[in-house]
Amino acid sequence: DLLRAGRCACENGPHTMVLSASVPDTAALAARLNATGVVKTVIVEETKWPGTVTGLFAHQRAARAFEKLCGWKLDRAAYENVYIHNDWSVLGRYLQDCRAGYILCEDTFGSTLGPDQHLVTDQRAAADFAAKQRGKGYLYWGDSPWCRCVESEDAAKCTLFAADHMVTDSKAALLQSLTEDEKAMVRRVFLTRPLPEKANGATLLLPRSFVADGLMTQNEQDAMFKAVAAKYAAGPLFIKTHPRDATDYQALFPEAVVLERTMPSEVLNFCLPFTFARAVTVQSFVLRGFTAADEKILLTLEEARKLV
């Protein structure tokens, strides 16, 4: 989104970027983003949202509650396009309550093209799906009637939606076309600590939070990722987890280099002076567009659990 904004000059000044206060170190990240001159950030306190509103004029009442408690109001007429990565979030529900006509970004590289789309298919199989299509409640992952279109790495290959509901936005093509100035801008935002110039044979572990998904306890998750690292890590260990993963990986792996959670994993494709010998993840799309490792290992959750 930062790169998109940088390439689309706005006559009214920097583009607006809305950040959830739940993002780690939100204020510091916002300051670095603002310093680029490309975007101006707005921090929204999503945790203050009171929950789903029902009854007469529910969407108007829910929108007003969000604006009052979360600290931001959308002026839809002020923006040509509104983009969001997770329309299941509080902010996504607000956009639906505002009838905003948003564009859903592909959250991870090629995620609309994967074989496992159970979140969408399960949603469509629910008994209340038709009612929600008529605006009675919320729909996510691009199914909302207030979602204008869905971005995909290759819209022609996506079978989830009708062709007129899709648009191609290739992150691979974008990353391949970056100028040195654009790369430097991204590094200034997302690389906040010195990194080693050399890391021969390094392994990159890319965890995510299964605790947040209710699939295991924190202790179980810690034990699982320690077992994954013990099995697959060789050489120096680097860790880059998902922004919503609150695990303290520095405490779990004291000798590892722990990268910023807020950094998109794609940044690693060009920001380091070396490539990793191996990159390992568990039940994630994160390695699809990843080019900075000689070997990529994707484990299922079941495979990872068996290592403990």
Cite the ranges covered by each PLM segment.
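Catalytic donor nucleotide-activated moiety binding site of glycosyltransferases and closely related
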Residues: 45, 233-262
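Short, charged/polar "capping" segments at the starts of alpha-helices
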Residues: 23-31, 91-92, 112-113, 213-214, ...
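Active-site and donor-binding regions of nucleotide-sugar-utilizing enzymes
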Residues: 1-142, 270, 285-289
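A nucleotide-sugar donor-handling region in carbohydrate enzymes
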Residues: 119-201
